[in-house]
Regions:
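Gly/Pro-enriched, hydrophobic low-complexity segments
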Residues: 123-205
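An acidic-aromatic
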Residues: 60-107, 173
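Flexible, processing/modification-adjacent segments and terminal tails
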Residues: 18-34, 43-44, 55, 84-147, ...
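Sec-dependent N-terminal signal peptides
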Residues: 4-13
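Solvent-exposed loop/turn segments connecting transmembrane beta-strands
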Residues: 52, 76-77, 169-170
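Buried hydrophobic packing residues in well-ordered domains
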Residues: 28, 40, 71, 85-86, ...
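One face of beta-strands
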Residues: 38-44, 58-62, 67-71, 147-149, ...
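Sequence/structural signature of outer-membrane beta-barrel proteins
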Residues: 47-49
Length: 205
């Protein structure tokens, strides 16, 4: 009898927590849903597992429109066409890589893709809050290289403030958002063309 009562109490509470996490994701997505485009400025670093060091904190920018994005970070420019193609230019090596990434691979480059593409492949839950922020946890339902994504949002209006991706090997990719603003994103922003990079080496995966 006690077991039945426990289950009756526990199951609705679990459902409520799930709706809360989904609601926070939907509220966060609204801050990025500008019809002409959204610009996000951020700082990011990669922390190796077992305190083996980290990359220098670097600044970058991300332009979003619908499911498309353009990432500028150091020598890297990465563009996703919103369908299936990712173009990735590395100025330090003058190489242009073209691939058809999985949703998990896209999330490693742009964790906010979770807000504009389906997160159906993840279990969502509210994690303990930090000062001034709510934290949404997303755990893959099947192995995909990511152990967990933590998305931080402002506790007042659910505006995205940062993200941390923990990979299966323990590596952490930490991103802190420093600004979100409206922008006018032209279609050409979401294409990288070989002709724009003289002498570039092109690799297609």
């Amino acid at each position: 009898m006690f077991r039945i009562l426990f289950l009756l109490l526990f199951i609705p509470a679990t459902g409520l927590a799930q709706r809360t996490a989904q609601g926070e994701l939907q509220a966060a997505a609204k801050h990025l849903a500008n019809p002409d485009g959204t610009r996000i400025d951020f700082q990011a670093e990669t922390i190796a597992p077992n305190d083996m060091g980290s990359s220098p904190l670097s600044s970058g920018s991300l332009i979003l429109k619908d499911n498309q994005f353009r990432l500028s970070f150091g020598s890297i420019t990465a563009v996703f066409d919103g369908k299936k193609t990712l173009s990735y230019y590395d100025a330090s090596e003058n190489t242009l890589n073209i691939s058809h990434p999985t949703n998990a691979e896209l999330a490693m480059i742009n964790p906010l893709i979770i807000l504009t593409r389906s997160e159906a492949g993840y279990r969502t839950a509210m994690l303990p809050p930090t000062k001034g922020e709510k934290v949404i946890g997303l755990t893959p339902k099947t192995a995909n290289g990511i152990k967990q994504i933590e998305l931080q949002v402002d506790s007042r209006d659910s505006r995205p403030t940062g993200a941390m991706i923990t990979l299966e090997d323990g590596t952490k990719i930490v991103t802190k958002i420093t600004g979100i603003s409206r922008t006018k994103a032209s279609p050409g922003l979401f294409r990288l063309m070989k002709k724009d990079y003289p002498g570039v080496e092109v690799d297609v995966y």
